[in-house]
Amino acid sequence: MNLLTIFVLVLIIVLIYAVYQIMTKSTTKVSGFSDASKSLSVPCSKFGANANFGYSTWIYIDSWQNTVIPPANPPAANAAIFFKKNILSRVKDGTTALFNLYLDNAQNDLKLLINGTPTPCTIKNIKLQKWVNITISVYGNTVDMYLDGKLVRTCVLTTVPTALATSDTLYVGGGYQTQTSTWSVLPDGDLRGYISNVVYKSDYFTPEEAWTIYSAGYSGAGMFDFVNRYKLNFSIVKDDQTVGQVSI
């Protein structure tokens, strides 16, 4: 192997590393493939916290189920409200919900609550029995919701979200209940299906990044698989004649 070939190989490695660093900057894979009906807890110490942030995940809704929970008799003034189709919930101190991404109990509408805002940001008619990519991007008090790589909803919060902390816990799947401003996990939920490739970014997602994640597919690792889907072909030319080829 001559010096020119070695130089080209080193240059290729440097370029690929630079592309990888750009594509994965501030981005962490939180969890892989999981049963959506079971609650999976992930300590947020593994992926940090920031004022601007984003989550991306794939969901597959296999079937729709509603568990009827009988009300108390007589009904309590502060009766618990059950959310049986949790996708992602970030919780502070085990009781305060900072971020709730879930499906409506009665219909296939995607809803997002941040910092307990009274009105959720909603996307109606999420497709059933099909893998769907959801990417949430938070910048200040603006929330962008992407579905399959396309921006479909922007919501403006009345206040800037509470800063996230590495001591928070992220719950993937399962369900939860709220009562008098407190939050508690339900180990089993009504979301029959799967959740795959949950990705956290300690900054907002750009439209290009949302599309890249969707393009990578549910079976990959989101942005981490983007580089692996492409190959680079280089030809080594001497006196207008190809003397070697390198494929990465």
Regions found by a protein language model. Give the residues of each.
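Extracellular glycan-associated modules
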Residues: 1-248
